[in-house]
Amino acid sequence: MPRSQKNDNFIDKTFTIIADILLQIIPTTQREKEAFTHYRDGMSAQSEGEYAEALQNYYEAMRLEIDPYDRSYILYNIGLIHTSNGEHAKALEYYFQALERNSSLPQALNNMAVICHYRGEQAIEEGDPETCEVWFDQAADYWKKAISLAPSNYIEAQNWLRITGRSKIK
């Protein structure tokens, strides 16, 4: 039984019912339906902190899904899991892959900026101001791109860009 059919949460159950109805109404192939089921089960597992199970579902969804736009969200969610696990290099790889398929993912750019900013903070703690500036400049570039896609979002990032003098778009 798919994970999404085991949910006790009212919202998850409602989403599952609506998604199942849509899958029956909208003309899709069996492969697309299976990919979506794995994606949905991955999201459910991820929301419960069951990252290994979520990754298994996302990898299976990736195997089945052929649409680049849909694949971008699967890759983005895989990146989120790696970010949560502190595997920042892996997370960045998945965010890059997601953006290659869908350049309109400000949330991926934001997460990449957060990782770069974190690495800049680490460089400060290690007494390496040159490396810090490189990471902060990279974070600024990602945040500027994210903000250009979603101007009313990322207020803290906008403030950081202004405070640090990095708000000018190159």
Swiss-Prot record:
> Which Pfam families does the UniProt entry name for this protein?
TPR_1 (PF00515)
Keyword terms? Chloroplast, Membrane, Photosynthesis, Plastid, Repeat, Thylakoid, TPR repeat
Instruction: List, in alphabetical order, the GO biological process terms annotated in this UniProt record.
Output: photosynthesis
Q: Does the keyword Repeat apply?
A: yes
The membrane topology term of the UniProt record is: Peripheral membrane protein
Q: What does this protein do?
A: Essential for the assembly of the photosystem I (PSI) complex. May act as a chaperone-like factor to guide the assembly of the PSI subunits.
> What protein does this entry describe?
Photosystem I assembly protein Ycf3
Q: Which organism is it from?
A: Anthoceros angustus
